[in-house]
């Protein structure tokens, strides 16, 4: 790699953000980029060594820990050769390991948690000035994350947080202890952010929360009363934003899924016919041990209602294999739910012991070989179901939002890729009724000609092509940004801004 490191203190310093984990982390990394851009840092060009490397971490699975510390160790020789280089670690694993991170990786300069992302520029400057590692973990949000600037990664699709934290107590999950109790944003703030993104050409937004259909239980603004119908109304309000073509959300909790949300999904044209709803297990006994607060028939009844209201809806899920005490009978019940639910795809995981969770102390932890064998059977079943469901799409005309980075073999197959409204990945031939160059962010229609377990194929060419402002922005190399609120952070080569007091979460 080419180095971009600089020797003068006044020179512009470059950064790179490496992200692990869920969509919330991806969006948090956009905020990290926004903060550093606002402070005068510059994103390092691809293929170069950055002056500052930030790891935004995940703590859900043990292999995430191992991967992170392995990657940090690879930077130790670079750090030794260039003392001016800085390494920062944030996110859930940093919130969990705290000072212990420095014991494992003493060459790290900054450790920050999930609640104080906004402190990163100040911590970097303090570590540089004092020549001493800085560890700052706080137990509650300093500012609602939406108060922070964000540099978006896509010209056409954007994440929008509607809440942070989680009130559930799933025994396998460490996230609530790291991200805190649920706090909901004001509806007006959310819609204002969506409108600002649409004004910059964004066509698709995904509403983010650990449990989106609990939205309304605890607004950050104490003046707003608790409202269990708030999420359904938020979906309908998104439907009234001119220029917003696609709305998605993730993830709902089956225990709190209400009929008014299904009605809002079906009656709001820009809400996509897609639902990602975690199952975790098809065994009622295991669901109880997980503290999931619903049972398999309740889960299946929600799917039935969604498909009754939206017959073409694609349902996706998460499933954990090998939870402590899971018997072959329990596993067979999971397979039966998979057969009945007909998921269009599933994120499947082998249970991983997470210290600090109730499940870590449960008896009857399963041998690795048993978990692996069950996992393989689940994958085989789900792939057969997915293939059958995808084959049903053959012959249909579908709308596709052209995307970038989705088709790993597009260069070999002379195809481009995008996402259908129901979230399915589509590989298509870039020929036919095309209005100029096809660009990520443009909208096309194609006929599905083939199917595989993980994608659809459209090899008969493009039926129609609509150029969009998102495509214009992508072509020009422009990405949307949301400025947030000035937080008075130190700047490197950027004008100082007047400090603005932030209402934050109202905490």
Swiss-Prot record:
Its EC number is 2.8.4.3. Residues 459-492 are annotated as: Disordered. The keyword Aminoacyl-tRNA synthetase does not apply. Residues 459-478 have a biased composition (Basic and acidic residues). [4Fe-4S] cluster 1 binds at residues 22, 58, 92. GO terms for cellular component: cytosol. Binds 2 [4Fe-4S] clusters. One cluster is coordinated with 3 cysteines and an exchangeable S-adenosyl-L-methionine. Residues 152-388 form the Radical SAM core domain. Keywords: 4Fe-4S, Cytoplasm, Iron, Iron-sulfur, Metal-binding, S-adenosyl-L-methionine, Transferase, tRNA processing. It catalyses: N(6)-dimethylallyladenosine(37) in tRNA + (sulfur carrier)-SH + AH2 + 2 S-adenosyl-L-methionine = 2-methylsulfanyl-N(6)-dimethylallyladenosine(37) in tRNA + (sulfur carrier)-H + 5'-deoxyadenosine + L-methionine + A + S-adenosyl-L-homocysteine + 2 H(+). Monomer. Catalyzes the methylthiolation of N6-(dimethylallyl)adenosine (i(6)A), leading to the formation of 2-methylthio-N6-(dimethylallyl)adenosine (ms(2)i(6)A) at position 37 in tRNAs that read codons beginning with uridine. This is tRNA-2-methylthio-N(6)-dimethylallyladenosine synthase.
């Amino acid at each position: 790699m080419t180095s971009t490191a600089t020797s003068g203190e006044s020179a512009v310093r470059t950064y790179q953000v490496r992200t692990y984990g869920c969509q919330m982390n991806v969006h948090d990394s956009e905020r990290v980029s926004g903060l550093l851009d606002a402070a005068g840092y510059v994103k390092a060009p691809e293929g170069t060594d950055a002056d500052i490397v930030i790891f935004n971490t995940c703590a859900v699975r043990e292999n995430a820990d191992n991967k992170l510390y392995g990657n940090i160790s690879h930077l130790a020789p670079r750090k030794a050769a260039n003392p001016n280089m800085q390494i920062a670690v944030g996110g859930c694993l940093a919130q969990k390991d705290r000072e212990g991170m420095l014991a494992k990786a003493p060459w790290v300069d900054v450790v920050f948690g999930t609640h104080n992302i906004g402190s990163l520029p100040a911590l970097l400057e303090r570590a540089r000035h004092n020549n001493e590692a800085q560890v700052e973990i706080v137990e509650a949000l300093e500012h609602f994350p939406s108060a922070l600037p964000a540099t978006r990664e896509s010209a056409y699709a954007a994440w929008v947080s509607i809440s942070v934290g989680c009130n559930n107590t799933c025994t396998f999950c460490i996230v609530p202890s790291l991200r805190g109790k649920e706090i909901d944003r004001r509806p007006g703030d959310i819609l204002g952010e969506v409108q600002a993104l649409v004004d910059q050409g964004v066509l698709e937004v995904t509403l983010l929360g650990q449990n989106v259909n609990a939205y309304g239980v605890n607004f950050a603004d104490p003046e707003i009363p608790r409202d269990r119908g708030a999420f359904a109304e938020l979906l309908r309000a998104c439907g009234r934003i001119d220029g917003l073509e696609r709305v998605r959300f993730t993830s709902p909790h089956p225990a709190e899924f209400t009929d008014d949300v299904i009605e809002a999904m079906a009656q709001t044209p820009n809400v996509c016919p897609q639902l990602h709803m975690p199952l975790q297990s098809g065994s009622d006994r295991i669901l109880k041990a997980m503290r999931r607060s619903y049972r398999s028939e309740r889960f299946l009844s929600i799917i039935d209602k969604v498909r009754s209201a939206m017959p073409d809806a694609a349902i996706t899920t998460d499933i954990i294999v090998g939870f402590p005490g899971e018997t072959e009978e329990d596993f067979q019940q999971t397979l039966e739910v998979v057969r009945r639910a007909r998921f269009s795809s599933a994120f499947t995981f082998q249970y991983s012991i997470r210290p600090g969770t109730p499940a870590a102390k449960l008896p009857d932890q399963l041998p690795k070989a048993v978990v692996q064998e069950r996992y393989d059977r689940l994958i085989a079943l789900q792939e057969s179901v997915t293939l059958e469901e995808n084959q049903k799409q053959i012959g249909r005309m579908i709308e596709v939002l052209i995307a970038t980075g989705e088709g790993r073999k597009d260069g070999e197959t002379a195809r481009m890729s995008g996402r259908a409204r129901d979230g399915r990945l589509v590989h298509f031939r870039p020929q036919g009724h095309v209005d100029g160059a096809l660009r990520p962010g443009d909208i096309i229609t194609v006929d599905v000609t083939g199917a595989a377990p993980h994608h659809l194929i459209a090899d008969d060419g493009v039926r129609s092509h609509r150029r969009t402002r998102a495509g214009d922005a992508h072509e020009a190399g422009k990405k949307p940004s949301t400025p947030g609120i000035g937080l008075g952070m130190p700047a490197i080569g950027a004008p100082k801004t007047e400090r603005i007091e932030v209402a934050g979460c109202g905490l």
